[in-house]
Amino acid sequence: MGCAEGKAVAAAAPTELQTKGKNGDGRRRSAKDHHPGKTLPENPAGFTSTATADSRALLQAYIDGHSVVIFSRSTCTRCTEVKKLFKSLCVPYFVLELDQTEDGRALEGTLSELAAETDLPVVFVKQRKIGGHGPTLKAYQEGRLQKLLKMNGPEDLPKSYDYDLIIIGGGSGGLAAAKEAAQYGKKVMVLDFVTPTPLGTRWGLGGTCVNVGCIPKKLMHQAALLGQALQDSRNYGWKVEETVKHDWDRMIEAVQNHIGSLNWGYRVALREKKVVYENAYGQFIGPHRIKATNNKGKEKIYSAERFLIATGERPRYLGIPGDKEYCISSDDLFSLPYCPGKTLVVGASYVALECAGFLAGIGLDVTVMVRSILLRGFDQDMANKIGEHMEEHGIKFIRQFVPIKVEQIEAGTPGRLRVVAQSTNSEEIIEGEYNTVMLAIGRDACTRKIGLETVGVKINEKTGKIPVTDEEQTNVPYIYAIGDILEDKVELTPVAIQAGRLLAQRLYAGSTVKCDYENVPTTVFTPLEYGACGLSEEKAVEKFGEENIEVYHSYFWPLEWTIPSRDNNKCYAKIICNTKDNERVVGFHVLGPNAGEVTQGFAAALKCGLTKKQLDSTIGIHPVCAEVFTTLSVTKRSGASILQAGCUG
């Protein structure tokens, strides 16, 4: 389904003038010549177009003579967006480009008085003023515009679409939006298709988080923590055999069984909500139309009033000899049918450090090759402490090197690989042999092969990310986007879920609540877990100035770790306060066990405007790690010692 470009109004000429201000004989067009859709009534007063009274009458004639009138300026971006909106709805409209009209300046002044609008565009629908760019888009998003257009039903409005909403991507955000929209009685379809990795790995419904991200990562992190707990248990009186071994195959089987149950649960939930699910690859082929191709190559065409892009990201490859042939990514690791053995992890992202951490935690020989800094975008003080802790626990780091070639020495499960790497600041070349090489150098948005250029959706050409409004709307009014593919937004599963639900509520339930992307809590599940909310120290200095922030910090020693006497003065707490705003806490950071559990509650406090004084007045729970935040007294600026002798300070 779709609509022909330039539909006629009342069987007349195309609805949008493309005359560039001239008529057939080359004369500059007068406002009186602009009537392509319907024949305008004769000038009721017989005035010349230069008179204010006549201008008002002429403008009123346009408004009365057409179902949809857009007073526009040809060079105005907002005007173009409004015209695209009506085109996308297949609704005929009349446009008067005032900058291409002989008496346009006078008409614009009169229009300002008549419509009480100070800028263009100005839109009228069925003789009712909708307003400018913002009010028009808002009326569309709330459904008021569509209802008004269908009053007395013009014959040339499009037929109903196949669906109210088609969602491309069956990850956490897309599924949340689908179920929420269906709850309001909307007809919803989800298209989800997993392109296999270079090694052929595929998975089921649920997206990255469920299949190859948060869920298996946390479970394997738990496997590593249990190994540490077994060691600690001897100090608590448990008689554990000295030769405790980890069974990779059993762990993978358990993890994949759990993921399989989640995949099935999602399909059941969609069915119960009456959401149509197709395991097919979605590509836009025209306005409001999409092609769905299944794994057998069978194609179907669907139409929808609105679309939501929730395609997520996939791991990036190095583009060097041997990377796709011999290396794995996180997309492969969590279902790897054999123990990876001696492993090189390439990258310094949270994915790289988390995977390196749990692989080392189950007893493997792990090396991390780092191009520059650890955990780019995170607080670097915390990132460096994580790196130090990992090194102290046997994980090796090769810093300021990048692989330039990966070769297979011996095939097998695992086999043997040779990695050739070059220094980032010299000509030095090094080589190393590993059983497995895992790439975790970043992720790319899945936006370049879904036909966005066909419907005019803008993306950042460098990153593939999609810029959106604060309501997750792309530059094409009927297409929205959420999740990791958004430009300059937090890439976290709960954020995508929240954005998806709120979007559906705005579109179909009359809500005006938008997703708040500020002060989003997160946790990095490295061996020493890192929880954070708000600004990093670097960002706080950049935003408020070093002289206007105060950093309170302290090491702490979890009581549970005192009996095995390990990792004293490794756990660390830090808050960053804005001294110009009553020492409001603008950054919260913690390294230690259960960091995510600790951070979650404090995130709510930060959203409520938590101050240092309020923290100080809070009585802590003893003995727990989180109580350290109620007793922070040493500032970084002071340089005083923050070492702890025991769990009670």
From Swiss-Prot:
InterPro entries (UniProt xref): FAD/NAD-bd_sf, FAD/NAD-binding_dom, FAD/NAD-linked_Rdtase_dimer_sf, Glutaredoxin, GSHR/TRXR-like, Pyr_nucl-diS_OxRdtase_dimer, Pyr_OxRdtase_I_AS, Thioredoxin-like_sf
Similarity field: Belongs to the class-I pyridine nucleotide-disulfide oxidoreductase family.
Disulfide bonds: 209-214
Protein's recorded name: Thioredoxin reductase 1, cytoplasmic
Post-translational modification: ISGylated.
Record region (Disordered): 1-49
Cofactor: binding details: Binds 1 FAD per subunit.
Compositional bias (Basic and acidic residues): 22-36
Gene this chain is encoded by: TXNRD1
Note: The thioredoxin reductase active site is a redox-active disulfide bond. The selenocysteine residue is also essential for catalytic activity.
GO MF assignments: FAD binding; identical protein binding; NADPH peroxidase activity; thioredoxin-disulfide reductase (NADPH) activity
Natural source organism: Homo sapiens (Human)
Domain Glutaredoxin: 56-156
NCBIfam families to which the protein is assigned, alphabetical: TGR (TIGR01438)
Active site: 622 (proton acceptor)
